[in-house]
């Protein structure tokens, strides 16, 4: 930044505010900060040798003698979860434990690469899935949950409908606490990754309690035991539902929430001592799905006692080629193409780009068969969306096959109608029985 001083008298009256004389060229005005008497510039623009760029955010400078104090209150520190964890030396933090990234982020694919990828995606999809119909729509309803007063009074049931379907999938897949398991002290813990306000876990808690009450008259000798919950999110959430869990069902529920990036999470250090674990998430964003799968498989407790995983995935357009959990799968797809001269990272960037067209939607006045003349690929809105669904299926299939290689049975399906949400695909993984 160029410094241009504005002529002025540094010995002006103390009654008058001493304005910094540094001229901000880009903003075409003088700095508005106050300077000390006898100084030409404010502390930010001072040329004193004891000021250095802040280690957390080099866009501002810090006086060396005040560095320790500044590091505790710097705005960047408040948002840097990994740095906070490192400073606190918490046992569940291990930097980069679940990451395999080389530190490089994906770049936008070149126009010619994007155009070239269209035929490649179509060919790969045809070879892998042939004329196989789209993923099946298996929307379910948890009747007990939908009978509750809260559900009935909801005006917008968009999220509640999704939760009801996912919860019923958990129940029918036996990822659920039964009265029999409670009787032999087999405790169940749900791990919600990317939990946000923990609304999904809250309704899992309500539904399991209602189900146990419904069947308790059949087996009065068994006592219902609420599952425990571990909630993970890297952001600070307002209006969290954590304190509602116990009041919703009238009994104490074990809950633990930790603010940490999944890439740095040592899961064993935060889990309760349960007999079995189930990992869940509703709309786990982009690369977080890959980090979560790796996090679960890096856990010794989950290796032995993880019963299953149910993740409603979203935002494939913010996945990372370097973090994708099954790179060998996509490299293998490319290798089998005789005309495949595209590198893995390039192809993955194109997959991400096309995935974004799955969730764009159209304004009511737009023709889905138009838009080809304005787009580099010369594809209409409908055609781009169709290629996007192919790209999304390829990314999701790689994740499913990764879990299969680790001893799980997997299924991909649409858990709700696309009119409810365009991010309508879920991955269910169940531990194979020996």
UniProtKB/Swiss-Prot annotation:
Single annotated GO MF: zinc ion binding
UniProt main location, coarse: cytoplasm
Residues at which Zn(2+) binds: 54, 60, 70, 74
Recorded GO CC terms: cytoplasm; nucleolus
Biological process according to GO: tRNA methylation
Pfam families in the record: TRM13, zf-TRM13_CCCH, zf-U11-48K
Statement: the UniProt record of this protein carries the keyword Transport: no
PANTHER family according to UniProt: TRNA:M(4)X MODIFICATION ENZYME TRM13 HOMOLOG
Protein name: tRNA:m(4)X modification enzyme TRM13
EC number(s) given by UniProt: 2.1.1.225
Catalytic reaction(s) noted: cytidine(4) in tRNA(Pro) + S-adenosyl-L-methionine = 2'-O-methylcytidine(4) in tRNA(Pro) + S-adenosyl-L-homocysteine + H(+); cytidine(4) in tRNA(Gly)(GCC) + S-adenosyl-L-methionine = 2'-O-methylcytidine(4) in tRNA(Gly)(GCC) + S-adenosyl-L-homocysteine + H(+); adenosine(4) in tRNA(His) + S-adenosyl-L-methionine = 2'-O-methyladenosine(4) in tRNA(His) + S-adenosyl-L-homocysteine + H(+)
Top-level EC class as recorded in UniProt: transferase
Originating organism: Kluyveromyces lactis (strain ATCC 8585 / CBS 2359 / DSM 70799 / NBRC 1267 / NRRL Y-1140 / WM37)
N-terminal signal peptide: none
Protein origin, superkingdom: Eukaryota
Keywords on record: Cytoplasm, Metal-binding, Methyltransferase, Nucleus, S-adenosyl-L-methionine, Transferase, tRNA processing, Zinc, Zinc-finger
Gene that this polypeptide is encoded by: TRM13
């Amino acid at each position: 930044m160029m410094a241009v001083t504005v002529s002025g008298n540094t010995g002006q009256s103390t009654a008058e505010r001493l304005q910094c004389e540094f001229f901000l060229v880009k903003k075409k005005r003088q700095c508005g900060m106050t300077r000390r008497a006898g100084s030409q510039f404010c502390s930010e623009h001072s040329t004193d040798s004891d000021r250095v760029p802040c280690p957390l955010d080099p866009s501002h400078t810090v006086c060396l003698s005040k560095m320790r104090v500044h590091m505790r209150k710097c705005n960047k520190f408040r948002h840097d979860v990994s740095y906070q964890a490192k400073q606190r030396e918490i046992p569940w933090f291990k930097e980069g434990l679940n990451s395999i990234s080389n530190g490089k982020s994906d770049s936008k694919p070149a126009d010619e690469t994007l155009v070239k990828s269209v035929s490649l995606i179509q060919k790969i999809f045809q070879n892998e899935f042939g004329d196989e119909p789209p993923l099946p729509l298996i929307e379910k309803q948890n009747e007990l949950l939908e009978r509750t007063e809260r559900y009935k009074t909801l005006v917008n049931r968009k999220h509640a409908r999704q939760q009801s379907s996912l919860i019923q999938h958990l129940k029918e897949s036996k990822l659920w606490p039964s009265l029999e398991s409670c009787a032999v002290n087999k405790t169940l813990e749900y791990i919600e990754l990317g939990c946000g306000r923990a609304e999904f876990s809250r309704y899992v808690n309500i539904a399991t309690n209602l189900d146990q009450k419904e069947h308790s008259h059949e087996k009065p000798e068994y006592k219902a035991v609420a599952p425990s919950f571990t909630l993970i999110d890297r952001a600070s959430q307002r209006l969290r539902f954590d304190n509602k869990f116990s009041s919703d069902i009238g009994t104490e529920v074990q809950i633990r929430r930790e603010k940490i990036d999944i890439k740095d999470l040592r899961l064993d250090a935060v889990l309760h001592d349960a007999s079995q674990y189930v990992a869940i998430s509703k709309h786990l964003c982009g690369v977080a799905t890959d980090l979560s799968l790796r996090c679960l498989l890096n856990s010794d407790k989950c290796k032995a006692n993880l019963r299953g995983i149910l993740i409603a995935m979203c935002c494939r357009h913010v996945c990372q080629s370097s973090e994708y959990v099954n790179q060998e799968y996509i490299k293998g797809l490319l290798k089998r193409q005789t005309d495949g001269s595209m590198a893995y990272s390039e192809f993955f960037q194109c997959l991400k780009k096309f995935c974004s067209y799955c969730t764009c939607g159209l304004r009511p006045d737009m023709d889905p068969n138009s838009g080809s003349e304005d787009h580099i690929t010369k594809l209409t809105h409908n055609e781009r969306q169709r290629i996007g669904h192919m790209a999304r299926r390829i990314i999701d299939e790689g994740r499913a096959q990764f879990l299969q290689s680790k001893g799980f049975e997997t299924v991909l399906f649409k858990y709700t109608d696309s009119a409810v949400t365009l991010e309508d695909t879920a991955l269910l993984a169940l531990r194979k029985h020996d």
